[in-house]
Amino acid sequence: MNFTAKSVPYQETGYFSKLVSDYLNEKDFLRHFYEHPVSYEGIEAAIRERELFPTDRHLLVKVLKEQYAGISLEDAVMKNLEALDRNNSFTITTAHQPAIFTGNLYFIYKILHVIRISQTLNARYTDRFFVPVFYMGSEDADLDELGYIYLDNEKLLWETQQTGAVGRMQTNGLEKIVDRIEGEFAGDPHGPELIQMLKSCYVGSENIQQATLKLLHHLFGRYGLVVLIPDNRLLKTVMRGIFKDDLTIHAPYEITERNNRLLEELYPVQANPREINLFYLKDNIRERIDRKDGKYQVNNTAIHFSPEDMEKELANFPERFSPNVILRGLYQETILPNIAFIGGGGEMAYWLEYKPLFKHYRVPYPVLILRNSFLLIRKGWKSKIEKAGLSTPDVFKPEEELMENFVRSNTTRQLNLDKQMTEMSGFYQSIKNISGAVDKTLEQHVEKLETQALQKLEELEKKILRAEKKNHEEVRRKIHEIREALFPLENLQERVDNFIPWYAEYGKAFLDQILQHSLALDQMFIILEENQ
């Protein structure tokens, strides 16, 4: 398989926020909220800062090797694990919760983006080494967001009554979805390989985070991707000081709140800090910690601590404290020798809140890079787009705009009344002159009559256009069909579809193609047209 790539500015797709557009355009107002530009100069500055920070590399590598125990490691992963123990190595990181079967396509895209950036930097800076890392948000408890996939717009839901951190959940019940996938894709060229991979990873694993680790290693291990599960006692010992600050003096709350007040002058704030930005994580519980009447209360439970007992709990069991979105990035950047973070638009918004928090704790702030986005167009749809008289970038436009453009370009009839409106304005001007000569106060009355008349003509013009559109209903049907196929559930394809149909058809060649067309530091939306 192979694709032809075209690129479109993110701003022209209509699917990205003003904040994202302004960040990509390096608007002056936002410059205060991040540290480094998305450029090689920004990368080099991030490296210099990171070299001064005492990352515990030995601890990191020890934990990673323990997490990979029992998995037959790809040579590229082993090489990268060994490299992380050296001071001249740095990570390029993306993060996501362990959505079942990788969830949406963008999960795959963001991983391939960190791999592409690492490859690019390794070629450019031969005296340093760059490792792609997937930081698994396995402590997230939002099963509603993580427990399903879409196949052909059908929602396949994991039916389970488990609660708490999704990464810790057992995989019971997922075999039903695997069976459903097998029934549909077993006959595809790479269907048997796909089914065996899913069964091995999910049916044969103790929990979701282990299943996700195995799946990502199977898919991306040959590229050297290192997967980190931060739900770990040893790693969290490094954070005890910051966690204590959060529990007692609420420094993260106060710092982030001040920054957000500045940010919200122009943009909606993505996440508001709480006085305590930690969850209590134990067994099947992940609940918010609140402070009430001088005691700490674990929300929705009978668990509570005195200040003294909470201090002991943190000292003895740091693994029971789970950072929320405000502290998650700080935890990530404390334990990894990281220089760049790749995330989606929502993640960019989170990270723009963090900079003062990083400054306060003297943790290096990474280069923020918007993850790559793709629209995949199969060869059959490419042909239909051309027959409808559209170019591939046109498909981002709303249906009505596409229809109007087609009608205006393909009709022999006059559809606008611009000439008539100009003539009418002249007509009313002459009446205004006549009446004004008699009584100046009549001019205002004539102006109102003109406004009303022009509005009536504008309404008529719209009716003429609507009537002409009805003469091209077949074109409308084709445009709707194209938009429905490329933008499932009226959303970007990457936010709905899963990688499974593509992998069943093309296997790892699909991943190779996405990687080949992935941009490194350039920031454009990529359209991939499947070639005949």
Which residues make up each language-model segment?
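A glycine-rich helix N-cap at a beta->alpha junction
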Residues: 150-177
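Low-complexity, highly charged intrinsically disordered N-terminal segments
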Residues: 14-75, 276, 457, 461, ...
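Short acidic, glycine/serine/threonine-rich loops at helix termini
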Residues: 105-106, 143-149, 238-243
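Glycine-rich phosphate/pyrophosphate-binding loops
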Residues: 104-105, 118-142, 366
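Long, compositionally biased intrinsically disordered regions
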Residues: 1-3, 215, 219-305, 312, ...
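A structural-propensity feature for long, helix-poor, extended segments
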Residues: 143-150, 376-408
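A translation/RNA-centric and nucleic-acid-associated enzymatic feature enriched
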Residues: 269, 274-339, 345-356, 365-367, ...
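N-terminal catalytic cores of NTP/NDP-binding nucleotidyl/phosphoryl-transfer enzymes
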Residues: 89-122, 343
